[in-house]
């Protein structure tokens, strides 16, 4: 980031915004997402409304929590730009056909082993991304929490777990395969199944510009059709 930069414009979709978050990192420079992609939940703003809103001061800056991950017992393979932070989520996923046995501890307390395709650790920002598709809760971006969400668990009693921002989450797996897939937002890498992963809240937050006419609830309704009931012709 060039010194003196006031803001970063991320022009594209949410994937572009995630890539921009890596570039901005802990610089404190805010990001404004301009939607030229598909869904545009993080990049929710239409190009024609951005300039007027910025010039008139009709915007605010919100903090978005980030995840920090530490890999033990292996070096990540498959990515040349390894960066241990994520805005949405960190995941561990099986690389083959066999289900994983996933051992998780939260601040040293062991959870029951998850027998599943994988595991998601998400921020409140990530609660409307992969975690949502896996059945996780929706959390306001102002909520400084972590979501632990198994992917396709082979257990009817498993539910997502929400833990506080101070939690330290340790993950290890039992696998018949030699490797597992680890993702951090839109970055993918391969890890040996003997590796372990520690995930916690990062010490810095991402600054995101939100236009005044927008809100988290409005984005849920307009982008994800939250609460819409087609039986009543979309009436609220």
What residue spans do the PLM features occupy?
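Short acidic low-complexity segments
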Residues: 1-5
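Gly/Ser/Thr-rich active-site loops/lids in small-molecule metabolic enzymes
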Residues: 113-157
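Catalytic core of DAGKc-family lipid kinases
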Residues: 39-117
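Short aromatic-centered micro-motifs
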Residues: 104, 126, 182
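ATP/nucleoside-binding phosphotransfer catalytic cores, i.e., glycine-rich phosphate-binding loops
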Residues: 84, 92, 110, 159-236
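Gly/Ser-rich helix-loop-strand patches that form or flank binding pockets
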Residues: 19, 23-34, 41
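Short glycine-rich anion-binding loops that position phosphate/pyrophosphate groups of nucleotides
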Residues: 14-16, 39, 125-127
